[in-house]
């Protein structure tokens, strides 16, 4: 990696890290391709871009859950990172393999692709609903941290705890289990703790109070609005595959209107073609001149 390119990547990593010190809360749209990343990056309130593992996979014809080959996922991340000047953090699921070496190789590839942050989840990649042992996931985190050190990029590592999302254990035990896992992951080198599957303010507040790390929540229709999350002390909120699924739902409704009612009403809400062209002219200039 060229010296100027490495310097720029370090700067973006530090910028992303600084955004995890609320207030204000960091609101992350999750892109699934270059077009969605360019749209999000063009908005005044967008300070960084996340990728959606589900969105990237499904858009390329794969189911979610590490069915997409690692090199294909990283190529998508590279295209997104090259298209925008904002920091990009990549959702890389469980790290593409059970061993710390697997997670380290994935992190190394993500940094080479231009990412400056990544998600690493403790849910089992085989889809059986289990979580990996905390010590095993902590070992992956340490391996990712070391891979970033070797690359000399201060990667922002967002460790995902899937206790609530996967409904692990009895409801009354989930808070304690989440805090225990989060503490282990933080000690291993995680910068932020991501707890999807929580929507009620009391649980969110309890996690913010008990975990000595910035907290990331996943937005759903039931999640408190951004100002309320900020008051609760949440550092980061991401939308996961939500915007991707919303785009698919809009496409489905639009096509249904055309095919079943012969209506073209959808066109009134479409992105104007000149705006689309402007996005890609800007992206083309960016690719030509480079980030620095």
Language-model regions, residue ranges each:
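Extended, intrinsically disordered, low-complexity segments
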Residues: 2-5, 242-292
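Alpha/beta enzyme core
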Residues: 2-239, 246-253
């Amino acid at each position: 990696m060229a010296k100027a390119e490495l310097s720029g990547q370090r700067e973006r990593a530090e910028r992303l890290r600084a955004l995890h010190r609320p207030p204000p809360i960091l609101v992350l749209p999750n892109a699934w391709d270059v077009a969605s990343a360019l749209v999000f990056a063009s908005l005044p309130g967008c300070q960084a871009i996340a990728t959606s593992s589900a969105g990237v996979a499904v858009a390329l014809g794969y189911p979610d859950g590490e069915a997409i080959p690692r090199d294909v996922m990283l190529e998508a991340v590279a295209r997104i990172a090259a298209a925008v000047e904002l920091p990009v953090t990549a959702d890389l699921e469980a790290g593409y393999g059970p061993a710390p070496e697997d997670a380290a190789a994935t992190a190394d590839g993500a940094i080479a692709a231009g990412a400056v942050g990544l998600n690493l989840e403790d849910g089992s990649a085989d889809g059986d609903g289990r979580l990996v042992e905390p010590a095993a996931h902590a070992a992956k985190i340490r391996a990712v941290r070391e891979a970033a050190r070797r690359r000399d990029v201060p990667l922002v590592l967002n460790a995902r705890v899937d206790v609530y999302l996967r409904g692990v254990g009895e409801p009354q035990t989930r808070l304690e289990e989440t805090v225990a896992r989060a503490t282990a992951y933080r000690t291993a080198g995680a910068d932020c703790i991501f707890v999807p599957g929580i929507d009620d303010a009391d649980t969110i507040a309890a996690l913010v109070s008990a975990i000595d790390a910035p907290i990331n929540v996943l937005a759903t229709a039931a999640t408190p609005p951004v100002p309320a999350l900020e008051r609760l002390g949440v550092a980061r909120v991401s939308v996961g595959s939500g915007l991707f699924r919303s785009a698919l739902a809009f496409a489905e409704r639009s096509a249904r209107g055309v095919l079943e009612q012969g209506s073209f009403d959808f066109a009134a809400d479409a992105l104007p073609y000149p705006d689309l062209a402007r996005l890609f002219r800007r992206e083309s200039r960016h690719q030509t001149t480079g980030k620095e």
